[in-house]
């Protein structure tokens, strides 16, 4: 008996350290002893850590070492560029301006990440990147030495758009779409089309836009930003909020479809605005471009599914490289031959078809594309911020732009709420989905300047309209991205039902199949 009891006590002591058994089920004496040992061991472990944090070690370590290392890397890159290209890397040169915008955007994003307000979720770093570019443009001394050619910025933004579309295509999960069915389709299509139509009507009567430009602006505003929505949905999902109802999955799946629709609508309107033919000719040309895009995307998508084969070395790297280069070539090449917008649809079809065959390998390819996006995101938002000058912002233009944006947002929120009324969600969940479907950032950062660049090249007399579109896109990012992020971070835990063990919950998507 004595031997058995001692063995049991020994097992209980070991299990206490590793198991998650509730404290009330453990012997209080053992608990007290273990807590005393734990406190002593923790104290012994903390002491050397405290000394390391109190005194600056030699050689330097920690944050200070990281700052110095990154600073030296930046300086060496500049020295190497200057030694190869000379004056291009000096103040006033094109590469110098690009470096300043890129690193300023990175610093702006890091600073915004460091800002922590109690009880308030962190703001998205892209807002800091946008403000960094805006600051560079509007500080006289810096602006005199920072110049980036319009051709360069146009190409970089087109590449950024390509990466967004690749991520959207790879992010479409066929299984989730089959489960969510009509609910996902409603959320992706309804609010986007209604906001685009509302923005077109309001901009036509308030901003005096022609109908073609009004709908072009509408599709610029119609897209939601996965860069803002997806990270917050992943955090909520990891903590078990709304998991059983499938709300995070629904929003993440629908965000890609929403962007696809908005970009397709924008490209169609852009081709109509800058074409010289009649309405019938434009419609026929649009249908032709769509057919060419679909055919090219299907052919290239099936090619990438089977080439390279699975027995090759560095398979993921080759697949990521092929998808990226093919899609960038499709987007830039279609612009070169006059098929504007065709490359975007080709990119979506290619990446979606290729991803359906890769299964588990798709996640690795997505990581490669995400790494490339981490490079182009500061460039994108820094260049967009640098396009906006305070001197060109007239108070009346800003006022009517904010009014148009606000009215269109109200229509979007109301439409989202009404469409979710028949999807089996509670009142609080519908409110949360409607507000979470508001943020704008990445698509607006790409499409807003695109109209301005096209006007500068093809139709300079239309440049005032394009500048107004750019202004509205800038204000949309500035207003909706931080507010949407704050609303999701604050209201998510309050309005969504939490399930305390999300790893054991099977998403009850079958409840949504009939809606």
From Swiss-Prot:
**Composition skew (Basic and acidic residues), residue ranges:** 1-10
- Gene coding for it: SLC9B1
Q: Can you tell which superkingdom this protein's organism belongs to? A: Eukaryota
- What name has this protein been given in UniProt? Sodium/hydrogen exchanger 9B1
Q: Which UniProt keywords apply?
A: Antiport, Cell membrane, Cell projection, Cilium, Fertilization, Flagellum, Ion transport, Membrane, Sodium, Sodium transport, Transmembrane, Transmembrane helix, Transport
Tissue expression pattern: Expressed only in the testis.
Location within or outside the cell: Cell projection, Cilium, Flagellum membrane
Q: Give the molecular function GO annotations.
A: sodium:proton antiporter activity
Region (Disordered) spans which residues? 1-32
What does this protein do, in the record's words? Sperm-specific Na(+)/H(+) exchanger involved in intracellular pH regulation of spermatozoa. Involved in sperm motility and fertility.
Compositionally biased tracts (Polar residues): 16-32
In the record, the note on similarity to other proteins reads: Belongs to the monovalent cation:proton antiporter 1 (CPA1) transporter (TC 2.A.36) family.
Q: Which residues cross the membrane?
A: 66-86, 95-115, 116-136, 152-172, 187-207, 215-235, 260-280, 284-304, 337-357, 368-388, 407-427, 431-451, 472-492
* Organism listed in the record: Homo sapiens (Human)
For membrane topology, the record states: Multi-pass membrane protein
Q: What GO terms in the biological process aspect are recorded for it?
A: flagellated sperm motility; inorganic cation transmembrane transport; monoatomic ion transmembrane transport; regulation of intracellular pH; single fertilization
Q: Name one GO cellular component term.
A: sperm principal piece
């Amino acid at each position: 008996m004595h031997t058995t009891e001692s063995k049991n006590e020994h097992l209980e002591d070991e299990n206490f350290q590793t198991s998650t058994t509730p404290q009330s089920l453990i012997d209080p004496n053992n608990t007290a002893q273990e807590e005393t040992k734990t406190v002593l061991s923790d104290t012994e472990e903390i002491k050397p850590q405290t000394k390391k944090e109190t005194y600056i070690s030699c050689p330097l370590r920690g944050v200070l070492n990281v700052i110095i290392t990154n600073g030296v890397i930046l300086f060496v890159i500049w020295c190497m560029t200057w030694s190869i290209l000379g004056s291009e890397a000096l103040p006033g040169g094109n590469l110098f301006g690009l470096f300043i915008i890129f690193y300023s955007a990175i610093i702006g994003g890091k600073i915004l990440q460091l800002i922590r307000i109690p009880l308030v979720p962190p703001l998205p770093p892209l807002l800091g990147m946008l403000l960094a570019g805006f600051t560079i443009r509007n500080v006289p001394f810096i602006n005199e030495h920072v110049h980036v050619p319009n051709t360069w910025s146009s190409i970089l933004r087109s590449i950024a758009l390509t990466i967004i579309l690749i991520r959207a295509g790879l992010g479409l999960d066929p299984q989730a779409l089959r489960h969510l069915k009509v609910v996902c389709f409603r959320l992706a299509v309804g609010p986007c089309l209604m906001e685009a139509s509302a923005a077109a009507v309001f901009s036509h009567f308030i901003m005096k836009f022609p109908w073609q430009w009004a709908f072009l602006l509408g599709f610029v505003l119609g897209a939601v930003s996965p860069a803002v929505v997806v990270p917050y949905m992943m955090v909520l999902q990891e903590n078990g909020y709304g998991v059983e109802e499938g709300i995070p999955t629904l929003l993440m799946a629908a965000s890609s479809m929403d962007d696809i629709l908005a970009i397709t609508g924008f490209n169609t309107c852009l081709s109509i605005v800058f074409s010289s033919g009649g309405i019938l000719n434009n419609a026929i040309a649009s249908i032709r471009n769509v057919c060419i895009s679909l055919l090219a995307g299907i052919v290239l998508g099936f090619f990438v599914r089977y080439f390279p084969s699975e027995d090759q070395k560095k398979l993921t790297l080759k697949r990521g490289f092929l998808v990226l280069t093919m899609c960038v070539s499709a987007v830039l090449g279609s612009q070169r031959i006059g098929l504007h917008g065709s490359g975007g649809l080709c990119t979506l079809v290619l990446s979606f078809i290729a991803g359906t065959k890769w299964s588990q390998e798709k996640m690795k390819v997505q990581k490669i594309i995400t790494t490339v996006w981490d490079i182009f995101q500061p460039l994108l938002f820094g260049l967009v911020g640098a396009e906006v000058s305070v001197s060109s912002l007239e108070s009346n233009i800003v006022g009517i732009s904010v009014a148009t944006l606000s009215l269109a947002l109200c229509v979007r929120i109301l439409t989202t709420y009404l469409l979710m009324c028949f999807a089996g969600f509670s009142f609080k969940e519908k409110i949360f989905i409607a507000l979470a479907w508001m943020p704008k950032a990445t698509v607006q950062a790409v499409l807003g300047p695109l109209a301005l660049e096209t006007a500068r090249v093809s139709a300079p007399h239309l440049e005032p309209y394009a500048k107004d579109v750019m202004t509205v896109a800038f204000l949309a990012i500035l207003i909706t991205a931080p507010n949407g992020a704050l609303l999701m971070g604050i209201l998510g835990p309050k309005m969504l039902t939490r399930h305390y063990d999300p790893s054991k919950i099977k998403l009850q998507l079958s409840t949504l199949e009939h809606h």
